[in-house]
Amino acid sequence: MAFTNTHMRSASFGIVTSLPDDIIDSFWYIIDHFLKNVFELEEELEFQLLNNQGKITFHFSSQHLPTSIDFDFNHPFDPLYPPRVLVLDMDGRETILLPEENDLF
């Protein structure tokens, strides 16, 4: 089961140049507090970043789970944020990246 044996966490170049630190940290917060040990997670998670009345919503869904979940945060939404973000677990090395960077990992 993925995301249960964390050794290292990082964010790709594309992520750190397109999202502020507090948004990046929110992905780890969601995984640690709401997804890990609640759902059997795959090695690749996908989130959509949505505009919810000027605030950001993280939409999580998986083709392997019958559930999708929206996480509303008070961070301001920026239309320049990437619409989709992936989080990979590669044997305990967890990385947040843009979908177009997936071939690099």
For each predicted feature, which ranges?
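N-terminal "domain-start" segment
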Residues: 1-73
